[in-house]
Amino acid sequence: MILTVTMNPSIDVSYPLKQLKLDTVNRIADVSKTAGGKGLNVSRVLSQLKAPLIVTGVVGGHLGDYLTTQLDNDRIPHNFSKIKGETRSCIAILHEGSQTEILESGPEVSEEEQAEFIENFEQLLRDTDFVTISGSLPKGIDNDFYSVLIEKANQTGVKVLLDTSGETLKTSIQSSFKPYLIKPNETEIADLLGKDVNSEKELINALDDDIFHGIEWIVVTLGADGALVKKGKDYYRVQIPIINVVNPVGSGDSTIAGLAYALSENKTSEEVMKTGMVTGMLNTQEEKTGFINPDHFDSLYEKVTVERL
């Protein structure tokens, strides 16, 4: 089973407008409200792939109840820890070809609530083979929190796919307990090392830095150029076809879902890379975030190439 972790989930509200008028009333007929957060995007794609999974994290208040109801409606199993604070909202106003976002920072999670989550997390690990940890941490939680989760998972033989950024990522990979897979982009690699990465050769050299030692999989996503992957001591260039992009938001989360799914199915390294790229591409072809059409999987899969460097 795959356990997905979302510590800072949200209700994503989308308001489509022909024109946003300031300092007056804007009436909206078509409102979309979905359970949001990077880990929930991962979860939806895993569900569409028919992978056995369970979702965890922290939720609170009326919006937390709404979020779990949405997951129930999608038949996605979950086991969240409850907190006193209210789950956040993230509002996107779509207007004149642009998108204006209003993002709440989210609730503060107390030390007691963190301890309760960790206890629940340890229970869930008993039936888990892989864990995906995605996104930011809410207020009140230190940057080393994911390191604690990785340690708990590693101690039970469970492998962790980590998709976060900034100081949280840096702290997590500098710990003595390593994630099994990370999925940074070139900018995040440069930020981690404090230097520019401007070519494939520089990127390969960067991935040989001591900070990455002990991480089995490093999947550096390159947008339309595919990915550069380090698996163990080997490097691979993964190239993808040109496709029509409808909505790129959530593609990274969909890639994580594909990688986790393929790993859980004991696929070969090449199959893992290709599956991750395909699920990421499939997401870009849908209007909704964290959605794929599995019927189109095979046709794209055949067009992805993997070259060992």
Sequence positions of predicted segments:
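Conserved phosphate-binding/catalytic region of the ribokinase-like
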Residues: 201-309
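Glycine-rich phosphate/adenosyl-contacting loop at the front of the ribokinase-like
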Residues: 1-56, 63-66
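Conserved phosphate/ATP/ADP-binding segment of small-molecule kinases
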Residues: 147-233
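Conserved N-terminal subdomain of the carbohydrate kinase-like
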Residues: 24, 48-128, 298-309
